[in-house]
Amino acid sequence: MMKKMLLAALLICAAGAGLADPVEGVWKTKPDDNGNFGHVQIKPCGAAFCGTLIRAFDGSGKEIASDNIGKNIIWDMVAYPDGFYDDGKVWSPDRDKTYNSDMTLAGNKLAVRGCMLGICRDGGTWSRVK
């Protein structure tokens, strides 16, 4: 009986492990102070989520080369109920600043916010690319 219960518990955990979190995917950022924006791929990293810049664009939407491609924009973001992610960091390339961050997911929109010393900066609403 105990073996059957243990096997059932393991199967439930294995089935749940295959489900992707809704925040996973590629997101288009809000334009920065220079009008540039990027595509950030969010995926699990340990027990949290990280986002890496995978493409960069100028204000007209033309893809541009950037030294920031491949750099983490988001890290240590922990999932909480109801589409809320917190306890992470976000790096703003245009200001070269790292902020304590939280995110709120609603469908294909991701509201990103960063705070430093009690002052918060709205990172804007990102749109799902895929």
Feature names for model-found ranges:
Residues 14-15:
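N-terminal signal peptide c-region/cleavage motif recognized by signal peptidases
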Residues 94-95, 100-103, 109-123:
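Short, exposed beta-strand-loop hairpins at the edges of beta-sheets
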